[in-house]
Amino acid sequence: MQTGHPADGVYLGLMSGTSMDGVDGITVRFETGKPPAVLSEAFVGFADTLRDSLFALQQPGDDEIEREALAANALAARYAACCHEMLRAAGLSPDDVRALGVHGQTVRHRPERGYTRQINNAALLAELTRIDVIADFRSRDVAAGGQGAPLVPAFHATMFGSPDETRVVCNLGGISNITILPAARDGRDERNDAVRGHDCGPANALIDAWALRHLKRPFDEGGRFAARGTVDETLLAALLDEPYFRQSAPKSTGRDLFNADWLDAKLAGFRGLAPEDVQATLTALTAASVADEIARHAHDCRAVYVCGGGARNPVLLDALATALAARGLDAPVATTAALGVPPQQVESLAFAWLAYRFNARAPGNVSAVTGAAGERVLGALYPR
């Protein structure tokens, strides 16, 4: 980071991921030469009506523009509620905050066609919070020929790199992604050309969808549904027979590909399987697709640190550890809490950091990760 930059100060970060269950927020102070200091955090859930609208926007249909605009307004209201809760908890006012970095809600991600769409009414959010809002982080990377994802590797390198060992940070959100952090013997540097990362495949997107269908619950709490089942190796092979898994990095994906329709098409020849066996197999799919990418790109990895909602699923973490060992990797699996950052904080903290980088007019992407033509300042400002 730059020395003594005037961008230092208090920032908010908001992230609502592909699970679409709510928004995670964080209040953090960034000061040059010091680790980020978390001042408060909050989670604000989405009502079923908003969640249904967001799911619907991921499918082609009539009147999408109207539905998107209304959903963006509803998101801004929930985001603002999260900000107000965090400010109260931290004892701060809007005037104390330099900026709010907000990811928005991804409803389309098609970088191969030159666009990615995260909905959010950032102007309304600035009005409701009276805080400078920095949003639309992915578009500039896509405009520069990149995937627009993942964007967190630069932050991961800053926070989690080691001078002594190669580490992998694995985000198990709706989609899984990895950041490969080679031993940084010259010190941590988010611009290190050796940092790599990409999306691996589905994680909670399919696991949650199957739990909702068969348990009427939004997720498989503690992985207990999967634990009741047995992995069907034939189905697992069919699920892994997807061109995306063979695609070379840089690459990114989302619910555009890995959704309930994709799963149903794969299940067409497996009608007799018990629901819990399918859930066990979906859990194994996530573990296998992540382990395959780590074995392919980070064979010298010595530790894997997990963040995202999947970090709360011990069955999934055990499956990942088993899959890594089966591929000859001696890499224990832990959550980022072992490195001092609770796993539920990592992504919202990353978007607060990206807002900080924007104010410093410093790059937020790693072009070697996304495939962009170069490093770019990411985001757009909506003044308070």
From Swiss-Prot:
Catalysis performed (reactions): 1,6-anhydro-N-acetyl-beta-muramate + ATP + H2O = N-acetyl-D-muramate 6-phosphate + ADP + H(+)
InterPro entries assigned to the protein according to its UniProt record, in alphabetical order: Anhydro_N_Ac-Mur_kinase (IPR005338), ATPase_NBD (IPR043129)
Record: residues binding ATP: 17-24
Keywords of the record: ATP-binding, Carbohydrate metabolism, Kinase, Nucleotide-binding, Transferase
Enzyme Commission number(s): 2.7.1.170
Listed Pfam families: AnmK (PF03702)
GO biological process: 1,6-anhydro-N-acetyl-beta-muramic acid catabolic process; amino sugar metabolic process; peptidoglycan turnover
Keyword Metal-binding among record annotations: no
Broad class of enzyme this protein falls into: transferase
MF terms in GO: ATP binding; kinase activity; phosphotransferase activity, alcohol group as acceptor
Similarity section: Belongs to the anhydro-N-acetylmuramic acid kinase family.
UniProt function note: Catalyzes the specific phosphorylation of 1,6-anhydro-N-acetylmuramic acid (anhMurNAc) with the simultaneous cleavage of the 1,6-anhydro ring, generating MurNAc-6-P. Is required for the utilization of anhMurNAc either imported from the medium or derived from its own cell wall murein, and thus plays a role in cell wall recycling.
Protein name, UniProt field: Anhydro-N-acetylmuramic acid kinase
Organism per entry: Burkholderia thailandensis (strain ATCC 700388 / DSM 13276 / CCUG 48851 / CIP 106301 / E264)
